[in-house]
Design a protein with these regions (language model features):
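C-terminal cap/loop subdomain of S1 sulfatases and analogous C-terminal strand-loop tails that border
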Residues: 1, 16-20, 24, 29-116
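Catalytic cores of eukaryotic secretory-pathway lumenal/extracellular enzymes that build
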Residues: 5-9, 105
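Active-site-proximal cap/loop segments of hydrolase catalytic domains
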Residues: 9-10, 28, 128
């Protein structure tokens, strides 16, 4: 899955059940909200938070993750959307050092059937409904950018968004 699907190991004796394996989706941004929740703290309410609280999932209180999608951005370009068992690519890179090429159409892959993303399932009317979900995810993200600016790629460590600099 091009670096999206990577292992996550968690150990917290007497809190997190040992020996559990899962293929549920968790994003690195979820760690912030999850760790806050697990330590009894609350996420700041004055800004948008990308992560979702995964503590019920990690603690074994539920079998599914609280995340069903993530957006893959490189610098300021949308590359893909992962939704449930599907990945929708808008750019393609054959090998790690090759240039990324924009696709003329979205390339949809069912990751359980094809984890190496070799065959697209773009047959007309077969997976078109997946694009509806991808478009909703992208639209929600674009709307969030209108509410709060993104931290630009390469921003200095002391970067402060305008919203907070003016306060």
């Amino acid at each position: 899955e091009g670096g999206i699907r990577t292992p996550l190991l968690i150990r917290w004796p007497n809190r997190i059940p040992p020996g559990v394996e899962s293929n549920e989706m968790v994003h690195v941004t979820d760690m912030f909200t999850t760790l806050l929740s697990m330590t009894g703290c609350k996420a700041p309410a004055d800004r948008l938070i990308d992560g979702v609280d995964q503590s019920p999932f990690f603690l074994g209180k539920q079998e599914t993750s609280n995340r069903e999608s993530c957006i893959v951005w490189l610098k300021d370009e949308l590359h893909a959307v992962k939704w449930k068992d599907f990945k929708i690519n808008f750019k393609r890179q054959q090998h790690f050092h090759d240039p990324e090429l924009a696709l003329g159409f979205a390339r949809i892959t069912h990751l359980k059937e094809d984890p190496k993303e070799r065959d697209a399932v773009n047959q007309r009317y077969v997976r078109w409904w997946v694009m509806q979900h991808a478009q909703r995810i992208i639209r929600d993200f674009e709307n969030s950018k209108k509410k709060e600016e993104l931290i630009p790629p390469g921003a200095p460590r002391d970067f402060v968004p305008k919203k907070f600099a003016e306060a």
